């Protein structure tokens, strides 16, 4: 009986810390996805939170144009762009299916630009309360050269960011 009371008290405390003045803090959640395992893991967390707090979810895929700046517009860029958009549609389809299975209202959108910038701007435009995203955990030279999209989103976002790490293989 004591354990049940403690668990109920803990749940009450958590719910009260997330709900202010009778209003849910999480009404709109943004899920940036790239189709990777870690981004799908992040989507699971986001959808679970959305289900618990009756929030809407916005799944976005950003076609990263930064590596292709300066390439001739015709020919190669168009082909690459189409391939990236197809990849994006598949990634968004997976997240949408997951949300629909959980009964969570979802919107999907494809964007073009620098991923961190687009994610932050989209979240601000939608007045998101939370961004949930995955991170691959780059280290060393790779991180110095490429940076971390998640790190830049954390630094620039107007709302909290939940970052889900790649699960360790057992």
From Swiss-Prot:
CDD domains: USP-like. Transmembrane segments: none annotated. It comes from the Archaea. InterPro entries: Rossmann-like_a/b/a_fold, Universal_stress_UspA, UspA. It holds the Pfam family Usp. Belongs to the universal stress protein A family. This is Universal stress protein MJ0531.
């Amino acid at each position: 009986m004591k354990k049940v009371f403690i668990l109920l008290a803990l749940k009450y405390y958590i719910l009260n810390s997330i709900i202010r003045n009778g209003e849910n803090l999480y009404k709109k959640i943004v899920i940036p996805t790239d189709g990777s395992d870690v981004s799908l893991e992040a989507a699971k967390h986001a959808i679970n939170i959305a289900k618990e707090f009756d929030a809407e979810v916005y799944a976005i895929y950003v076609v990263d144009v930064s590596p292709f700046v300066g390439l001739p517009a015709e020919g190669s860029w168009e082909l690459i762009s189409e391939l990236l958009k197809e990849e994006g549609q598949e990634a968004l389809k997976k997240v949408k299916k997951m949300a629909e299975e959980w009964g969570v209202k979802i919107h999907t959108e494809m964007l073009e630009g620098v991923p961190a910038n687009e994610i932050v701007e989209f979240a601000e435009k939608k007045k998101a309360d939370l961004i949930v995203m995955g991170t691959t955990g780059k280290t060393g030279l790779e991180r110095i050269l490429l940076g971390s999209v998640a790190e830049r989103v954390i630094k620039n976002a107007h709302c909290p960011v939940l970052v889900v790490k790649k699960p360790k293989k057992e």
